[in-house]
Regions:
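Metallocofactor- and cofactor-centric catalytic cores in central/energy metabolism, strongly enriched
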Residues: 1-211
Length: 211
């Protein structure tokens, strides 16, 4: 089993990153490496989808792919690999002969470049979680979706700090826009949240905790 590298959560080993065969969260190295491969396939897809040439299928794969790589969302290697294959097929249908991006280039980049690209990547993953839930309710924002492709393309390019920093800022702005979209999707679908009293007495379990 190959070793892993993952440092996207705040609980990484030694506060520097999980290596070896298992992460602090329980993720195995084979799954971590498959998630890196999936990310590389998403960069390939972003390159294959030119601006304004998105489709429902490419959007769904972009959102699913990014959402899948968030901490504790999917540790099933088989489903991660299956999704990678679907993304690869979508990219091949659009622009054949292009290779997936090697995400190790990000982890091995100079510290400042690695940090800025990681902020973009992890920001896109978090935003994708909001966008995916809004998408499931039928709400899509073209500006948000276009930025997923733009951001993933930039991760696969040789960019300096002066070019990456504005994209980091834009990632934050898009994240806020996506939170607004999800709020609209939820309130228009389910109504406005209402503060409600709940009992605090201890009952016999088991329980499902919902926050």
């Amino acid at each position: 089993m190959e070793e892993m590298f993952c440092f996207q959560c705040q609980q990484t080993a030694h506060n520097t990153g999980c290596e070896g065969h298992t992460g602090v969260c329980g993720k195995k190295s084979d799954t971590a490496n498959l998630q890196d491969e999936l990310t590389g396939e998403l960069i390939r897809l972003a390159r294959a989808v030119a601006e304004n040439e998105r489709s429902r299928s490419s959007d769904e794969l972009m959102l699913k792919g990014l959402f899948t790589t968030i901490t504790n969302v999917n540790f099933n290697s088989d489903t991660v690999k299956k999704l990678s294959d679907e993304i690869r097929e979508e990219a091949e249908n659009r622009k054949p002969g292009k290779d997936a991006y090697n995400v190790q280039k990000i982890w091995e980049a100079p510290e400042d470049i690695r940090s800025l690209k990681s902020l973009i990547l992890f920001g896109l993953r978090g935003t994708a979680a909001y966008a995916y839930h809004a998408w499931a309710l039928g709400y899509v924002d073209a500006e948000i979706m276009n930025f997923f492709y733009k951001g993933m393309r930039i991760l696969g390019e040789e960019k300096g700090m002066e070019e990456l920093l504005p994209v980091v800022i834009e990632t934050g702005k898009i994240n806020l826009r996506c939170m607004e979209l999800l709020d609209k999707a939820n309130t228009e679908s389910y109504g406005d949240p209402i503060p409600t009293e709940v009992p605090l007495t201890i009952e016999k379990g088991p329980f499902i905790v919902v926050s």
